[in-house]
Structure formats: C-alpha cells, structure tokens
C-alpha cells in the first residue's frame, strides 16, 4: 500500500507542477546527474562571462528527523493531498513509538511526533513536500535542492548583490524558525567562484555566526573550486 500511496502523491505533485523546479531529489526523470549538469552549466556560463558567483552551502541538522508531523499534514493538505490518502499518511506517521535504553533500563514508550520514516519509499517524498516552500522565501537568489542538500547562490557584481544574498540567507533562517527545522551554522560555508583578481568580498552571517569561506566544496560527489575548476572523485 505504501508504494501505491507514494506513486499517487508523486503523480499528483508532478502533474500539477507543485514541486520546486530546482529540486532534483527523489523525483521522476531527475537525479544527481541532472542536478549537476544544469548547475555546472550555469556556473560555467557565469565564469565564461567573468561574473562572480557566491554560493552558500547549507547544512541541515537532522533534517529528516525534525519534520513535525502535524505541520507536514497541513502542507500535504495545502498541496491537495486529502481524504483517504491524507488519512492513510497520518496513520503511517502516527503509528510509531520510541523508547530510550540506558544501562539496561528502558524508558516508557512514547509516540514519535516528528521525523519522516527513513528506510521507507514514502518518507523521502514527504520530506520534499515539507521543504518545498523554502524556495518561496528567496527574493533574488537561486536555491538548488537535492533532497536536503541545499545551496543558495547569486551572481555578484557589487556589495548590493551581497546584501541581497544575505537577505535571502536571513529569509532561510526565518523559514527554519517558521517550520521548526534547523541549520548548522558552523557546518554551512561560503564558496566564491570567480576568475577575478579582486572579487567582491562579504562576510555572510547565519544566526549572527560568520560563515566560513572555503576555497573548495563538495557537492553531490564532485568538488567545486573557487577558481572554477571542478573534479570528480576517483572511482
């Protein structure tokens, strides 16, 4: 039954173009390769035009485990998942319990009220639904998503562009607060891709934490470098 529900939900989302277009995770005809192809082409085009691109590589804290069930159900309903399908998903989420074992002693059994079940086919699709509206918080920057792997980025020509990117980073922090998710500021980083000798520099902040600037960053199996070289891992 889970496979039937998953297929129904995905078909509904895809046929009505409800999923964010730059989300390539767990979707029909999309993959890690399709994400990398379009992203690398975009970055290469900017580099060819000698345009700087600043990337904010985000890091979710326990992304799949933190999704609140009731808020997820509200989002599913908003996207048109209702009636028997919504009832089944509610039962799928709620019929789960947890207990803590310490030194051989077990705590009382408690219901699990957050998290999409991992190791299931439906869980990842539910996660896509939950983070789908993160893109709506962006005003001038682009957002790339592959499940929870996320990058906020923008072409930079002046400090004003940096300020705009910072505003969208602040907006991501508001989304995080609104929907009870969490980013790891100390694990997020900034990669500036440019061939310019004097690039536009900016200290980006998340929760008043200055994000680390790096010269290279791994993304979906490749390493992006600030001078626009990129390498694949050795097989």
Positions of PLM-derived features:
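Catalytic palm subdomain of template-directed nucleic-acid polymerases
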Residues: 62-79, 150-174
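Conserved pre-catalytic core of RNA-dependent polymerases
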Residues: 1-117
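Hydrophobic alpha-helical membrane-association signature
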Residues: 39, 126-130, 165-168
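Active-site palm subdomain of RNA-directed nucleic acid polymerases
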Residues: 5-23, 48, 124-153
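Short, charged alpha-helical motifs in flexible N/C-terminal segments and linkers
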Residues: 44-52, 173-192, 218
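Basic, alpha-helical interaction scaffolds
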Residues: 139, 209-235
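Short, conserved catalytic/metal-binding micro-motifs enriched in Asp/Glu and His
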Residues: 5, 59, 76, 89, ...
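Short, conserved micro-motifs composed of acidic
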Residues: 167, 182-216
């Amino acid at each position: 039954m889970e496979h039937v529900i998953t297929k129904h939900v995905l078909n509904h989302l895809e046929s009505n173009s409800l999923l964010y277009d730059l989300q390539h995770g767990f979707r029909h005809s999309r993959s890690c390769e399709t994400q990398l192809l379009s992203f690398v082409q975009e970055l290469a085009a900017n580099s060819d035009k000698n345009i700087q691109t600043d990337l904010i590589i985000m890091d979710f804290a326990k992304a799949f485990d933190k999704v609140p069930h009731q808020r997820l159900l509200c989002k599913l309903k908003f996207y048109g998942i209702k009636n028997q399908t919504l009832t089944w998903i509610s039962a799928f989420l709620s019929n789960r319990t947890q207990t803590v074992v310490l030194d051989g002693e077990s705590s009382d059994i408690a219901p699990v009220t957050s998290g999409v079940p991992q190791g299931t086919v439906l869980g990842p699709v539910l996660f896509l639904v939950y983070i789908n509206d993160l893109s709506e918080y962006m005003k001038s920057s682009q957002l790339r998503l592959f499940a929870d792997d996320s990058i906020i980025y923008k072409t930079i020509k002046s400090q004003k562009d940096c300020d705009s990117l910072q505003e969208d980073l602040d907006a991501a922090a508001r989304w995080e607060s609104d929907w009870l998710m969490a980013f790891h500021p100390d694990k997020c980083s900034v990669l500036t891709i440019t061939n310019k000798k004097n690039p536009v520099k900016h200290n980006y902040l998340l929760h008043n934490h200055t994000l680390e600037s790096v010269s290279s960053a791994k993304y979906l199996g490749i390493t992006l470098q600030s001078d626009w070289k990129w390498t694949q891992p050795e097989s």
